[in-house]
Each structure stands twice: as C-alpha cells, then as structure tokens.
C-alpha cells in the first residue's frame, strides 16, 4: 500500500491528485475511492494511504484512507 500527500482536491468536481512518496508522477483520485463516512473530500496536504490502479488516463488511487 502506497502513502502520499494530497496535492489538491476539488470537492465540487469530486476529484483531485495525490503525490506519492515513492514516485515522481501524481496519481488521480476520484471521490468514490475515499474510504470515509459522510461527505467524501480530501484536504490539501493531507497524508493518505492508497493502492495504485490503472485508470483510463493513467494511474488512479483506490481505497484511499487518511493516515
């Protein structure tokens, strides 16, 4: 399981990007992959843990949880 920092997240559009600790490229994150109750959003610079899958346009975070 990878860890990283939320680069940005737009709650209105429901997506953003995470910068993994062990990679140069950012990873797309969709609100549906955030594993929290209630309103699913991420704060900028929040520490997260996630799996990396392959989306239609590149790497995508799955199973995202706050660290």
Curated annotation (Swiss-Prot):
InterPro entries for the chain: Cold_shock_CspA (IPR012156), Cold_shock_domain (IPR050181), CSD (IPR011129), CSD_CS (IPR019844), CSP_DNA-bd (IPR002059), NA-bd_OB-fold (IPR012340)
SMART domains: CSP (SM00357)
Alphabetic keyword roster: Activator, Cytoplasm, DNA-binding, Stress response, Transcription, Transcription regulation
Alphabetical list of CDD domains matching this protein: CSP_CDS (cd04458)
Induction: In response to low temperature.
Top-rank taxon: Bacteria
CSD domain residues: 4-64
MF terms (GO), sorted A to Z: DNA binding
Presence of the UniProt keyword Cytoplasm in the record: yes
Gene3D superfamilies named in the record: Nucleic acid-binding proteins (2.40.50.140)
GO annotation, cellular component aspect: cytoplasm
Main location: cytoplasm
Subcellular location: Cytoplasm
The protein's name: Cold shock protein
Source organism of this protein record: Arthrobacter globiformis
């Amino acid at each position: 399981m990878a860890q990283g920092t939320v680069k940005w997240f737009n709650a209105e559009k429901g997506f953003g990007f995470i910068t993994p600790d062990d990679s140069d490229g950012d990873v797309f994150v969709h609100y549906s992959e955030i594993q929290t109750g209630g309103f699913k959003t991420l704060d900028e610079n929040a520490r997260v843990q996630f799996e990396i899958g392959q989306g239609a346009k590149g790497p995508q975070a799955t199973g995202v949880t706050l660290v």
